Every structure is written in structure tokens, then in C-alpha cells.
Swiss-Prot record:
A GO term from the CC aspect: host cell cytoplasm
Chain spans, region Disordered: 794-817, 916-972
UniProt site positions, description: Cleavage: A442, W443, A486, A487, A495, A496, A508, S509, R715, A716, A734, S735
Name of the molecule in the record: Structural polyprotein
Effect of A675D: 60% loss of pVP2-VP4 and VP4-VP3 cleavages
Species annotation: Infectious pancreatic necrosis virus (strain Sp)
Outcome after substituting R212S: In strain: Isolate Mason, Isolate Blake and Isolate Tseng
Effect of D585I: No effect on polyprotein processing
Length: 972
């Protein structure tokens, strides 16, 4: 799929055929042209007001359907006409195949004198052929299917229905369009020759029993031998041999006429009749043979054929009693074929649209559009440019996966026309990889489509929509890590520095001198993908596989393989179905691309690509598009499996290389890439790694790892599991199992370092950071609201740089450090007993004066927590420094703006000092003193206590007017 356009063009052409054709991206790369053909019919409604449209949505030729009317009594159908494309394709083209098709069926033309249209439409898609439909009445049409997505009922004719062709298969061959071949000048006038539609024909064969022919009632009257269903819409060829013998010699020559009638839906009038006549005489009555050989061109198939009838008659009355017995000279049979009948879409499935109670003589409009891939005939090819189809497995598989989820996404074959028009916006979103699927989110389908895109479509095209121009450069750096799987589950490369390459071009790394390594460079073409869940094997071993892509230097990625006992070549891709042998022919292994240099245990093993190990022990294996496994890790796994593993599968991935002595394991490269593959399954990578295990005995490795290998499987969580290995992968220098792979990765690292100072490096890191932190949706919504980045620019112009606050030790370590510090101080002061443990028991306090005096006097260690007050001098009752006590008392009581503290309060403060040995009050004692002060201030006064009054205010001096000047009262 072209990620520059970021559009699934093939899927878009299927769901929106009016947008035009797009080449089918499969591996049929014929030169062709793309052509869109229209079909437009105005069908006149009969007097009954009812009829049926038979649509062939997948037919690759020009005939796309047929129209039938019900008779006036609605007791029988009458064929009206074929529905075909505007151009007869076989006139100009030799081969073709259908890409997509759509019909719109609606009525909007009023007959003269009417003001409104009546009538309704029923439509249903039937998975079988037309002859298998039991009833074509309006009401019984809905019983053809139980799938609600394949039927529409009681839709007004003015609203209309839409029929959409959804492919039933994607293996579509080019079919011959029954074109006429050039003829010579001496040909008879009117004679012509055509290439018949003989690709995948549907063949019918009527086998008659070896018994008596049923008697005829009279001469010239047909007697039926067989009558049954058959579907034919294209040319057919009839061949047959009906042989019989008469019981008696005929009196006269008797003519036997065997007649094969091809009939349609509407009546018993044959569309085409094939007759074979033979004379029974005295010479041949013991073995008479009637041969049938006739070709019927498409022009003679004037309506869809749904029934055949084989009958016979005779011309002699005397021969009626002469018994004829079939099969005298061999089987009696008649066969005929339906051209292209087994091509998907030619005869099945079909869509039936019935209309009822429409106004007679009103018009029913059928407007269709069909998209084709066509190969012109030689005459037209001289003046027309053709192009090869592009093989795009991603585009094809994305279409497959979307259409395989048609029920969840509500993609239908028949629609109410207004619903289909409403859904076109969703279809455009699904096929546009740069869309964030806002409409699909409203319908509840965004998660499904996103999940499919992650598997089958380029992830970078949906990673950062506004960075679409950078996609081509992004896949050089981190694209390989974020876009990991191709359509259908096939791996893509995931090493840094390389473009995306399908495993079609990859090769499992190994020794170049392997027995099969060179012969298998030209691998088989295969596109099959399967997953198979197997029960827990009796034993097994998991090894990593490193793949490289020679067309892209530096390309490398990893996967896992599990080697189990048994022969399972059918579970391997055709490229991996290689059988290798142990030394001295002591066993074999499927899926290994080189012979094993040591002896086996006379058993056969199979190396299968591993996808998942479930908790119950079941293993899920898959077919991947890659070559067979080669390399030292596979040989190490086989050595452990043959010599050491007796039961079960160790939950770990083994890597390493067995030395020549077959006992020593030497270092091996590729640890980083193998670790990514192992960690995705929640498995550890175990074995000989550079700098970890320089040299380990084979037996000791098995004893140490296998016996303890009971680790539970824990799958990596999150959708960004590959991103977190980016730093490790870029920093590593070891990514291969041989010198060639090491050289390739060194080139990758050098190329990655070249862009570290470029602006693109910052953009790519930003994209990775955005996806890693799940900010893609938020950034995309912000970009729509702030297209000029004015708000965002102001927001991030000064990024926050908060220095990280140093984290101190936790409480336990802090207390231990405190105890150690107090212990050192106490020991320096002479208290040798004060160890950190003793300080901790003493409530993390140093020795008190009593404890220190006790130690000095007795020489024994004091008990932690005991103050030994008897060994210290009792404090004085009232300290001599009363000034200090008064200052504190006045401060607590409330001076200097309130009354001085009473003597009782001084005494209370002095008592606190005495209690503390001369020290001031602690926090609790200070709170008690403040409470005592408040109580003393609220204490009521005695009546004898004089109340202090204020002195009266002095009167103000007499004022004067500011207009009266000072001096005498003289006249101004």
C-alpha cells in the first residue's frame, strides 16, 4: 500500500464504486486498463404493479441482471429484458475481471394524471444460485436469509434501495469475455468464431439408469426422462451419448428423438432446445446410440436458464410396445456446462429486488456502476496504454480484514439508499489512513478499525496525521519498531535504520556453507497465513531466529521458534518445508535449513514459528513468509532437546553456540534483537551472552536453566512495547549471528548517527515520544482547534524545568542514622555504654544526667528509659533568678498593654522552672500556663477593690472664626 497517499484505494473502490476503479493488488500482474461502465434502465411497471429484479453483483461480464414482471393475476413471471452495461465489453476486450459494482433502484417518475407514487421494495442477497430460490413472491423473499445485513424490507420506492457488491473471494482470475476472433476473407458471410467463456465452468451431467425407458403414450408425444435445476447465463456446450437396445426386431424403421430443453423462470417454453435423432433398424436394434453435440452461444441465451428437461419420442405406433433398455453399450448420459459458472459472482451469490403495488405504467429506474480491469483486443491494444497491476499484500489484506469484520462494522450487501449515502463518510474515513476516524468513533467502530490498522496497515500513517510528509523519512528510523506486522500477520522488519520489507525478501541468518542454504535462495511463492493452536507438547525448546533483508543493508528483526517432537510439515509455509538430518542419519528435523553437526536420538522434530504460549501450556504456531531456520541457537536448542530436556517446555528462550568439543558454549551476538522477540512473549532470554557467561558447560547450562525453568509466562503489556526497546537497540553493537549480519548492523548504526544533528531527528523523536505517552489523539485535536499553533506556542515556549527535590532517607534509615550520631557524641563524652542499639531503646535520646551519674558511680550500664533521678541533685523549689521568671510570666500573661501578672502566676511559673531543673517550660507546660493566665483574667473582682477610673478630659480652648483677624475688635 502506498503510504504516501495513505489511502486504501482498492477497498475504497469496493465500498464506494462511484469513486472509480482501482487495480486489485494481488499477485496477478497482467497489463490492463481500468474502466468504469454505467448501466441505466427505466423499466416500465406492468398492470400487476409487481415484478422482480435479479442482480448478479459479482458477474465479470456485461450482463449484470435481469428483469421479470408478474402477470396480471400474479400467478406467473414474464421475462422482460437483460440488464447490461452500456458498452458490450466483448466487442473491444478479450479478458476482464470485476473490481466493484453498485446498483441504485428507485422510482421517481409519475405517470400522467398521478400526484403520488405507491409501492414498496423488498431486497435480499441469496448465497445460492437463481434456480435454488424456492419462491420469488414479494413476501417470501425475506426468508432467503437470516442475516439482517443482507436484506431490506418494505422500503418505499421513492426512497430506493442500493445493492453493493462485496467480494466473496479474492482469488479472481481474468475471464474470457467471449470475444470474436478475426476471420479470413474467404469465410462465409455471417460466419464467426468466438472464444468461449471456458474458465472455471460449472459442469452438469445427467446420468440415466440402465433400465427400461418409460413407455410413450402415443407417437409424437414427448415422455420425460429427467427434469431438474441448472443455472446458465453464458454460452454452453452440450455433449451426450444415449445408447439403448430394443427387445424385439422392429417391424419398420423407428425414429427416436431425444430432446434437451433449457427453460427459464417464467414459463415452460424452452429458451434453447437440443435434439438428437437416431433410427433403430434390423441391423442395429441390439445397440442403438443417439449422440448429442452442440454449442449454444451467449446470444441464444435470451434469458436466465434455471431448468433443464430431457425427454424422448418415437414416430412409429408399432414400436410403442417394443421395450427399449438403456445402457447397452455403456453409461447413458448427457452433459452440458455453464461458461465461467464457477467463477465467484457469475452464478452466485445473487441479489433479488422485488417491488409490489406500484402504480401501473410508472417507471422504475435502475442505475448501476461497474469497475473493471480489462485487457484490450489486439486491434485496440495498438492505441491504448496498459499498465501492470501492483502487488500490494498490505492493501489486499487490509480489504480482507475489513470485509471479514463486516458484521461488526455493519457493512451490508443491500441498503436503504439514504442509509448508504449517510455511510459514505465513514467509508471514506476507513480507507483514509491519515484520518483519526471521528465519524467512526460516533458509530462505535473506531477501536475495531484501529485494531485492524495496527495489524494490516501502516501504523505511521495513523501515528501523527499532520506529519504525513515525513512518513517516507520516518520509516528510516523508528518506523520499523512501530509497524511490526504486515497484513495477515506476516512479520515486517523492526530493526532501526531500514525501510519496511516484507519477509518475502528476508533470509534466516546462518552459515553460508549449509547444505540447503544456497539451494533455497529461490523460494516458493506463497501468501497463505494460518494460526494453529496445539496441545502442550511432550517436550520442546524455544530458540530465537534473526532475519536479515539483503536488499536493505542493516535490516534485521527477530522472531521465536519452538522445536517439538513429531512431523508437522503441513504447519510450515512452503518456503520452510525443508527436512534436515542429524549426523550419521540419527534423526531429522523439519524447518531447519542446514544439517545438524551432531548425532540425534533417532527421532523426528519440527521447528515451528511460535506466536504464543498460553497459560494452560497450549502453543499457538503460525505460518510466516520466511525461509527455514538456520544458525547456532537452533543447534543449541536441538542439543538441549536431544540430551537434556526430558519433559515439558522450559519457559525461556535459549541462545548460544556450541563449540567444536560439543560441550562448551561460546559467546554469540544478536542479544538485543533476540531479547525483543523474547520479551514480547514475557519470556527471558537465557544462555551465553557476551560479558555475562563467557564459557558454560552444556550440561551445567541444562542443569541450571532447565531444572529451574518454571517461570510463568507474562505477556508484555501496552501497545508500545516495541518503542521501549528503541534506546537499547540503538545503543547496542551486536545484532547478528555471523560476521555478515554484524557488518550490516554496524552500517545501520553509522547511518543512524549521521542524522542525529539534523532537524528530522528531532521530529522523529517527537513522534516517538507522542505515541509512547498516548498523546496522538490529544495533539491531533489540538491541531484542529489551533491551526497556527498560537496557543500551543505560548504554552511550550518556556518548558517547565523543575529541579527535582532531593529525596531524603525514609523514616527507618533516618532514625538509625540519628541513633548512630547520638551514640558517637555520647561515647566521646565518656558514656561508653551508649551504643546505637541502646540509644534506640532509650527512645532515640542520649544518656540523661541520672543515667550518666549511675554509670560513673556503679560502672554498670543503665537501663534505657530509667532516668535515675536519685543520682542527681534535687532542683531548687524556687530559682534564684527571679528576673528571668518574671519576664517569662509577664510575656505569657499579656504585658505590656494589660495588667501585670499577679503573684500567684509568678509562683506557677517558678514551679515549672523548679520541675524542669532550671529549664523553661516545654510546649505542653506553656499551653497550661496560657490557660491559667486566661482563667486569672476572667476572675471576678472583689467589691473592696477600687476601680481605676480615667481622668476627665480637658476642655478644648475657645475657638475663633477663621474670618476674624487676630487683634482688637476694630472695624475691618
Amino acid at each position: 500500500m502506498n503510504t504516501n497517499k495513505a489511502t486504501a484505494t482498492y477497498l475504497k473502490s469496493i465500498m464506494l464504486p462511484e469513486t472509480g476503479p482501482a487495480s486489485i493488488p494481488d499477485d496477478i500482474t497482467e497489463r490492463h486498463i481500468l474502466k468504469q461502465e454505467t448501466s441505466s434502465y427505466n423499466l416500465e411497471v406492468s398492470e400487476s404493479g409487481s415484478g422482480v429484479l435479479v442482480c448478479f453483483p459479482g458477474a465479470p461480464g456485461s450482463r449484470i441482471g435481469a428483469h421479470y414482471r408478474w402477470n396480471a393475476n400474479q400467478t406467473g413471471l414474464e421475462f422482460d429484458q437483460w440488464l447490461e452495461t452500456s458498452q458490450d465489453l466483448k466487442k473491444a476486450f478479450n479478458y476482464g475481471r470485476l473490481i466493484s459494482r453498485k446498483y441504485d433502484i428507485q422510482s421517481s417518475t409519475l405517470p400522467a394524471g398521478l400526484y403520488a407514487l405507491n409501492g414498496t421494495l423488498n431486497a435480499a442477497t441469496f448465497e445460492g444460485s437463481l434456480s435454488e430460490v424456492e419462491s420469488l413472491t414479494y413476501n417470501s423473499l425475506m426468508s432467503l436469509t437470516t442475516n439482517p445485513q443482507d436484506k431490506v424490507n418494505n422500503q418505499l420506492v421513492t426512497k430506493g434501495v442500493t445493492v453493493l457488491n462485496l467480494p466473496t473471494g479474492f482469488d479472481k482470475p481474468y475471464v474470457r469475455l467471449e470475444d470474436e476472433t478475426p476471420q479470413g476473407l474467404q469465410s462465409m458471410n455471417g460466419a464467426k468464431m468466438r472464444c468461449t467463456a471456458a474458465i472455471a465452468p460449472r459442469r452438469y451431467e445427467i446420468d440415466l439408469p440402465s433400465q427400461r425407458l418409460p413407455p410413450v403414450p402415443a407417437t409424437g408425444t414427448l415422455t420425460t426422462l429427467y427434469e431438474g435445476n441448472a443455472d446458465i447465463v453464458n454460452s454452453t456446450t452440450v455433449t451426450g451419448d444415449i445408447n439403448f437396445s430394443l427387445a424385439e426386431q422392429p417391424a419398420d424403421e423407428t425414429k427416436f428423438d431425444f430432446q434437451l430443453d433449457f427453460m427459464g423462470l417464467d414459463n415452460d417454453v424452452p429458451v434453447v432446445t437440443v435434439v438428437s435423432s437416431v433410427l433403430a433398424t434390423n441391423d442395429n436394434y441390439r445397440g442403438v446410440s443417439a449422440k448429442m453435440t452442440q454449442s449454444i452461444p451467449t446470444e441464444n441465451i435470451t434469458k436466465p436458464i434455471t431448468r433443464v428437461k430431457l425427454s424422448y419420442k418415437i414416430n412409429q405406433q408399432t414400436a410403442i410396445g417394443n421395450v427399449a433398455t438403456l445402457g447397452t453399450m455403456g453409461p447413458a448420459s448427457v452433459s452440458f456446462s455453464s461458461g465461467n459458472g464457477n467463477v465467484p459472482g457469475v452464478l452466485r451469490p445473487i441479489t433479488l429486488v422485488a417491488y409490489e403495488k406500484m402504480t401501473p405504467l410508472s417507471i422504475l429506474t435502475v442505475a448501476g456502476v461497474s469497475n473493471y480491469e480489462l485487457i484490450p483486443n489486439p486491434e485496440l491494444l495498438k492505441n491504448m496504454v496498459t499498465r501492470y497491476g501492483k502487488y500490494d499484500p498490505e492493501g489486499l489484506n487490509y480489504a480482507k480484514m475489513i470485509l471479514s469484520h463486516r458484521e461488526e462494522l455493519d457493512i451490508r450487501t443491500v441498503w436503504r439508499t439514504e442509509e448508504y449515502k449517510e455511510r459514505t463518510r465513514v467509508f471514506n474515513e476507513i480507507t483514509d489512513f491519515s484520518s483519526d476516524l471521528p465519524t467512526s468513533k460516533a458509530w462505535g467502530w473506531r477501536d475495531i478499525v484501529r485494531g485492524i490498522r495496527k495489524v494490516a496497515a501502516p501504523v505511521l500513517s495513523t501515528l501523527f496525521p499532520m506529519a504525513a510528509p515525513l512518513i517516507g523519512m520516518a520509516d528510516q528510523f523508528i518506523g520499523d519498531l512501530t509497524k511490526t506486522n504486515a497484513a495477515g500477520g506476516r512479520y515486517h522488519s523492526m530493526a532501526a535504520g531500514g525501510r519496511y520489507k516484507d519477509v518475502l525478501e528476508s533470509w534466516a541468518s546462518g552459515g553460508p556453507d549449509g547444505k540447503f542454504s544456497r539451494a533455497l535462495k529461490n523460494r516458493l511463492e506463497s501468501a497463505n497465513y494460518e494460526e494453529v493452536e496445539l496441545p502442550p507438547p511432550s517436550k520442546g525448546v524455544i530458540v530465537p531466529v534473526v532475519h536479515t533483508v539483503k536488499s536493505a543493508p542493516g535490516e534485521a528483526f527477530g522472531s521465536l521458534a519452538i522445536i517439538i517432537p513429531g512431523e508437522y510439515p503441513e504447519l510450515l509455509d512452503a518456503n520452510q518445508q525443508v527436512l534436515s538430518h542429524f549426523a550419521n542419519d540419527t534423526g531429522s528435523v523439519w524447518g531447519i535449513g542446514e544439517d545438524i553437526p551432531f548425532e540425534g536420538d533417532n527421532m523426528c522434530y519440527t521447528a515451528l514459528p511460535l506466536k504464543e504460549i498460553k497459560r494452560n501450556g497450549n502453543i499457538v504456531v503460525e505460518k510466516i513468509f520466511a525461509g527455514p531456520i538456520m544458525g547456532p541457537s537452533a543447534q543449541l536448542g536441538l542439543s538441549l532437546l536431544v540430551n537434556d530436556i526430558e519433559d515439558g517446555v522450559p519457559r525461556m528462550v535459549f541462545t548460544g553456540e556450541i563449540a567444536d568439543d560439543e560441550e562448551t558454549i561460546i559467546p554469540i551476538c544478536g542479544v538485543d534483537i533476540k531479547a525483543i522477540a523474547a520479551h514480547e512473549q514475557g519470556l527471558p532470554l537465557i544462555g551465553n551472552q557476551p560479558g555475562v557467561d563467557e564459557e558454560v558447560r552444556n550440561t551445567s547450562l541444562a542443569a541450571h536453566l532447565i531444572q529451574t525453568g518454571t517461570l510463568p509466562v507474562q505477556r508484555a503489556k501496552g501497545s508500545n512495547k516495541r518503542i521501549k526497546y528503541l534506546g537499547e537497540l540503538m545503543a547496542s553493537n551486536a545484532s547478528g549471528m555471523d560476521e555478515e549480519l554484524q557488518r550490516l548492523l554496524n552500517a545501520t548504526m553509522a547511518r543512524a548517527k549521521e542524522v542525529q544533528d539534523a532537524e528530522i531527528y528531532k521530529l522523529l523523536k517527537l513522534m516517538a515520544w507522542t505515541r509512547k505517552n498516548d498523546l496522538t489523539d490529544h495533539m491531533y485535536e489540538w491541531s484542529k482547534e489551533d491551526p497556527d499553533a498560537l496557543k500551543f506556542g505560548k504554552l511550550i515556549s518556556t518548558p517547565p524545568k523543575h529541579p527535582e527535590k532531593p529525596k531524603g532517607p525514609d523514616q527507618h534509615h533516618a532514625q538509625e542514622a540519628r541513633a548512630t550520631r547520638i551514640s558517637l557524641d555520647a561515647v566521646r563524652a565518656g558514656a561508653d555504654f551508649a551504643t546505637p542499639e541502646w540509644v534506640a531503646l532509650n527512645n532515640y535520646r542520649g544518656p540523661s544526667p541520672g543515667q550518666f551519674k549511675y554509670y560513673l558511680i556503679t560502672g554498670r550500664e543503665p537501663e534505657p528509659g530509667d532516668e535515675y533521678e536519685d543520682y542527681i541533685k534535687q532542683p531548687i523549689v524556687k530559682p534564684t533568678d527571679m528576673n528571668k521568671i518574671r519576664r517569662l510570666a509577664n510575656s505569657v500573661y499579656g504585658l505590656p498593654h494589660q495588667e501585670p501578672a499577679p503573684e500567684e502566676f509568678y509562683d506557677a511559673v517558678a514551679a515549672v522552672f523548679a520541675q524542669n531543673g532550671g529549664r523553661g517550660p516545654d510546649q505542653d507546660q506553656m499551653q497550661d500556663l496560657r490557660e491559667l493566665a486566661r482563667q486569672m483574667k476572667r476572675r471576678p473582682r472583689n467589691a473592696d477593690a477600687p476601680r481605676r477610673t480615667r481622668a476627665p478630659a480637658e476642655p478644648a480652648p475657645p475657638g475663633r472664626s477663621r474670618f476674624t483677624p487676630s487683634g482688637d475688635n476694630a472695624e475691618v
